[in-house]
């Protein structure tokens, strides 16, 4: 009550921010007459003037009034479009590291030109980030004339571009591209083998369009660059045949492990678990199929990978549905983006899930992939010095933007008042009743010439509605799963009188639906239109536009509520643009996923009390409130998941930044010999310590083991036993110095043969390749640790703290392994002529290029807990037999027999 009173007196923070910015807008408007008097040349010269002022130390914020006035005037001359005052406000919000919420149709694309121009003046680059390649190209080409008029260069960053083309795009003042491509380029740059291969500059300012989609909806799925791993397709096929014999547990007991069925499903967390009966049955079937030996357990260390196959196959059959989560096309399983309904060609699920789905569908199984590099959007976009974003719906997620990205959300007022009618939800008992009501509503509205946009949450649902409309003889267009440039064209014409368009989630987002259709596209279709033709097209459009307005404007039908209120608001926001008439309504049934999982008991209880009959709908504020509460539950759960993901990824992010920083330093220097010498000293000290403990008695020395290690790992023949025999007084310290000196001299002889420059290049190449190889293995180990760490909670330990502690220990061990591997490779390489080193370097580069060609980019992963960290250690030790005198794999530096080997 007190907060409401204070807000009434002083205004909300949003109001105060807009009042402050309105004063600057007034200044810009006062400048307009003077700016209008400038010639084109004088207006263009303003860009150079601003740059000079910045170079002399003037603060960027001081340029806002004049710079915005210049962009507005340039837009008037180039496009014939003048920025509204609310667009100037939006531009200022975007310059202040904030999220600007601007309603659909308020001109976000034109608004973005203001902060993009202002921040490009420093010459450090601006990245305008969009959700797909089509929008990136469209916005870049549409705005190119304006920016080039003002003397700025434009670049477009698209997939499959060559490195020189990408470098040119990033060198431009303003670069348009997708969030995926910017992120993948960052990862690829940090896998480059020479400075010339890198394409990005330092990350300066990112302006993210549809920011809620990119920073929230896609935040849970990291960007991953992966390479091929071992082939295990046969096992997926064999395990897949067993899964259909398992029966789902009907009732979810508090102890799902003791249930009646073979597996239980948790729909809220999208997890599936074997019950005790299921475990017994699957073990029995595995034995009968000859996959597992009699008397073995699926949970025994030797069967960890088999458990991985069973879990993946079970999830593929139970949790992933054809035409909802994926489609099968030309013998290939293609993921469907849950947020947009579009197919994601070339993207694959990780952890063997994609292979399990391929086995289920009977298509060719492709090899599993191993992660080479990964980053979440949360951590990628936080690398920018300055970040801002815009969307039509951000206010419901303001807390998340603030807590994770430190971005405030400012709601920018509309240019004209919103008059759209948002009708109350109608709830039916069954899906069939709901679909029937939707068809009748469409029939009535189209009969009056009113255009209708039907929003669905999946391809499957859009096809169901489409089939019913076809049966009813209602002409319509369907947008789902396949993104192409025509999508925007279809969406732009969805405002034609009586048009019916079905679209999944956000298909066509970024394109306005103009009442009466788009006259611009009609003119564009003509080769060389005359003035008369253009006038006739505009006149015909005006008649259609007026007819649609008279019928009530665009009507939005939601076939069910989404998990997030924000996505519902996005669908509603397609109607009522720029003060146009419009309406919206959601149709729900008790069989909808959201209602079934989160709101079923309470709402179905209400419906029973009201004595509803088949075909009747309930329309009541209580129901709407219950649904809103269900959505809040889901939003809260999803926020917790994203927050938890970030907390864990922050640990990996610190390590990633350290590795990438070290790697970039390595790329930028030509001579790493000092580093090599320092590493060699550390490695030999650690190695000798394993066999000759410091200040120990000679009886404790393992000279035979040391000689063997030096021979095997460093190709050094050192008669240490003979030295000690010939020189009884040989001191331990002197012995250490002699071993190191001999190693250095042996290496110097190699250097004399091949030449200093060649050896420096080879050293650098070996360091880079070894670093990449160990980092790749470390990422896999971190994944396994992350998947099993939640089990530490059962031991009354904080999983996050345990993860931080163990991942740091793993990182330290990796750095020690890096030193050892580098010195081992450099010591063992046999060279006689410079050509041999050159051949080795060429071979190394060819191998790196081959791996680069085999890389797969993915932004769709699945974070299921498949293996515990303890199980991974055992599995790894079973894969590779460790000799008793070998260094212990734990990275302690001790011999295996003196460390973890003592347990056997």
Curated annotation (Swiss-Prot):
GO BP term, pick one: protein targeting
Cofactor(s) the protein requires to work: Zn(2+)
Catalytic activities: ATP + H2O + cellular proteinSide 1 = ADP + phosphate + cellular proteinSide 2
Keyword Nucleotide-binding: yes
Lineage: Bacteria, Pseudomonadati, Pseudomonadota, Gammaproteobacteria, Enterobacterales
Primary site of residence: membrane
Keywords carried by this UniProt record: ATP-binding, Cell inner membrane, Cell membrane, Cytoplasm, Membrane, Metal-binding, Nucleotide-binding, Protein transport, Translocase, Translocation, Transport, Zinc
Region (Disordered): 851-870
Family per record: Belongs to the SecA family.
Protein name according to UniProt: Protein translocase subunit SecA
Binding site for ATP: 87, 105-109, 512
Enzyme class of the recorded protein, top EC level: translocase
């Amino acid at each position: 009550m007190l907060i409401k009173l204070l807000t009434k007196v002083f205004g909300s923070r949003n109001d105060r921010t807009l009042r402050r910015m309105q004063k600057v807008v007034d200044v810009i408007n006062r400048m307009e007459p003077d700016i209008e008097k400038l010639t084109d040349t004088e207006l263009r010269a303003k860009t150079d003037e601003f740059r000079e002022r910045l170079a002399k130390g003037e603060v960027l914020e001081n340029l806002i009034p004049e710079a915005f006035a210049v962009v507005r005037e340039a837009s008037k001359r180039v496009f014939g479009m003048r920025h509204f005052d609310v667009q100037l406000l939006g531009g200022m919000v975007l310059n202040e590291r904030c999220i600007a919420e601007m309603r659909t149709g308020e001109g976000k694309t034109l608004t973005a030109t203001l902060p993009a121009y202002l921040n490009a003046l420093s010459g450090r680059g601006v990245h305008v980030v969009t959700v797909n390649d089509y929008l990136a190209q469209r916005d870049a080409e549409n705005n190119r004339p304006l920016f080039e008029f003002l003397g700025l260069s434009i670049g477009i960053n698209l997939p499959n571009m060559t490195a020189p083309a990408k470098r040119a795009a990033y060198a431009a003042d303003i670069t348009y591209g997708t969030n995926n491509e910017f992120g993948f380029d960052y990862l690829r740059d940090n896998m480059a083998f020479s400075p010339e291969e890198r394409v990005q500059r330092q990350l300066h300012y990112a302006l993210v369009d549809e920011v809620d989609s990119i920073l929230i909806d896609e935040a849970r799925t990291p960007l991953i660059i992966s390479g091929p791993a071992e082939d295990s397709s046969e096992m997926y096929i064999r395990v897949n045949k067993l899964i259909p014999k398992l029966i789902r547990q009907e009732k979810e007991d508090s102890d799902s492990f003791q249930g009646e069925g073979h597996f239980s499903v948790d729909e809220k967390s999208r997890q599936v678990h074997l019950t005790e009966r299921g475990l017994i049955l699957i073990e029995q079937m595995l034995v009968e199929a000859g996959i597992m030996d009699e008397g073995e357990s699926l949970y025994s260390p030797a069967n960890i990978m088999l458990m991985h196959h069973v879990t993946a196959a079970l999830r593929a059959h139970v949790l992933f549905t054809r035409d909802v989560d994926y489609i099968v096309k030309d013998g290939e399983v293609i993921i469907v983006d849950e947020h947009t309904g579009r197919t994601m060609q070339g993207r694959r699920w990780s952890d063997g899930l994609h292979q399990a789905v391929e086995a289920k569908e009977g298509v060719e199984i492709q090899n599993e992939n191993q992660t080479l590099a990964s980053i979440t959007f949360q951590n990628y976009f936080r690398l920018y010095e300055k970040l801002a974003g815009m969307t039509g719906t951000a206010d419901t997620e303001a807390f998340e933007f603030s807590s994770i990205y430190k971005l405030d959300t400012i709601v920018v007022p509309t240019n004209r008042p919103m008059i759209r009618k948002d009708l109350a939800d109608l709830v039916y008992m069954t899906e069939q009743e709901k679909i029937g009501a939707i068809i009748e509503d469409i029939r009535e509205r189209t009969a009056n010439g009113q255009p209708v946009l039907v929003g669905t949450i999946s391809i499957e649902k859009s096809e169901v509605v489409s089939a019913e409309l076809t049966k009813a003889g209602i002409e319509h267009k369907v947008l789902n799963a396949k993104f192409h440039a025509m999508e925007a064209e279809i969406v732009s014409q969805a405002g034609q009188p009586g048009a019916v368009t079905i679209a999944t989630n956000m298909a066509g987002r970024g394109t306005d639906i103009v009442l009466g259709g788009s006259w611009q596209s009609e003119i564009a279709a003509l080769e060389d239109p005359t003035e008369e033709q253009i006038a006739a097209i505009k006149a015909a459009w005006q008649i259609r536009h007026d007819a649609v307005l008279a019928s009530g404007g665009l009507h939005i039908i939601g076939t069910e509520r989404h998990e997030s209120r924000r996505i519902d608001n996005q669908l509603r926001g397609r109607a009522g643009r720029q003060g146009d008439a419009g309406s919206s309504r959601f149709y729900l049934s008790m069989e909808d996923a959201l209602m079934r999982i989160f709101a079923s008991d309470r709402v179905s209880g209400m419906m029973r009390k009201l004595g509803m009959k088949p075909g009747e709908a309930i329309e009541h504020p209580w129901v709407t409130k219950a649904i809103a509460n269900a959505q809040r539950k889901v939003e809260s759960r999803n926020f917790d998941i994203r927050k938890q993901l970030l907390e864990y990824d922050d640990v990996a992010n610190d390590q990633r930044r350290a590795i990438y920083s070290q790697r970039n330093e390595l790329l930028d220097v030509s001579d790493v010999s000092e580093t090599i010498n320092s590493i060699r000293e550390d490695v030999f000290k650690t190695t000798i310590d394993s066999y000759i403990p410091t200040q120990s008695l000679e009886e404790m020395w393992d000279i035979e083991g040391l000689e063997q290690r030096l021979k095997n790992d460093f190709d050094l023949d050192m008669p240490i036993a003979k030295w000690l025999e010939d020189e009884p007084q040989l001191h331990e310290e002197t012995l250490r110095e002699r071993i190191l000196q001999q190693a250095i001299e042996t290496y110097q002889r190699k250097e004399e043969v091949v030449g200093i420059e060649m050896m420096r290049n080879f050293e650098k190449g070996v360091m880079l390749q070894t670093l990449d190889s160990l980092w790749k293995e470390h990422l896999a180990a971190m994944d396994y640790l992350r998947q099993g760490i939640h089990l530490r909670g059962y031991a009354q330990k904080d999983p996050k703290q345990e993860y931080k502690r163990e991942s740091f220990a793993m990182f330290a061990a990796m750095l020690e392994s890096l030193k050892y591997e580098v010195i081992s490779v450099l010591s063992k390489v046999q060279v006689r002529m410079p050509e041999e080193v050159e051949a080795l370097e060429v071979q190394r580069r060819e191998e790196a290029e081959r791996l680069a060609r085999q890389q797969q980019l993915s932004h769709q992963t699945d974070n299921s807990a498949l293996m515990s960290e303890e199980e991974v250690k055992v599995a790894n030790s079973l894969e590779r037999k460790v000799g008793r005198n070998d260094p212990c794999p734990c990275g302690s530096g001790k011999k295996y027999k003196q460390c973890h080997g003592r347990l056997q």
